[in-house]
Amino acid sequence: MIHNRDQMSLSSKERLIFYKVSIMDNLSERIKSELLEKADPKYREFHSGLVPGTENIMGVRIPELRKIARSAAKEDWRNYLEKCCPDTYEEVMIRGMIIGYAKMDDEERMQYLNRFVPEIDNWAVCDSCMSTYKFMQKKPEIWYSYLRQKVEEGTEFSIRFGVVGLMDYFINEEYIDRLLKIFDKIQHEGYYVKMAVA
């Protein structure tokens, strides 16, 4: 830790970098601390059975993760998303939720989602984070195209991400025929794709 006297000898650019790193460390540490405080071993055991093969589950319930993510989305969330290397299932979930809760334009949100979607390795992160992406309803044509592209990427969880988003926000008279055509064309043997389209 740099003490105040040491900070005085830093240039303004160095002080800004130090300040941003301190904030990120504080936010990251606060999130880790809250997760430890809210972790429930019984829930961890139960939830581990729902997401087989997923490691590093702490056992924090989804409503608590949403509270943490909403709070983080009011702080220096950009720095957090850029620098954070999630160690736990819950930290990955929080990153995805922050993308939904933070205020940003569509282009920036797409950039963060493009980095986040490849990190998804289970249905729960995919579906829980998608439910925070209500912004997709505000500009449906942009987000319909984006989700269609995710389906076309062809990986198990990019397809699921696209399908779940289309089902959450685009099942209406305007889009239903298009969705059915997209779903009919999906040829993927992944279990979580099949369950999303079923």
Cite the ranges covered by each PLM segment.
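Short intrinsically disordered, low-complexity coil segments enriched in acidic
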Residues: 1-6, 196
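Intrinsically disordered, low-complexity segments enriched in serine/proline and basic residues
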Residues: 6-18
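Alpha-helical scaffold domains
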Residues: 23-198
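N-terminal leader/targeting segments
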Residues: 3, 10, 23-26
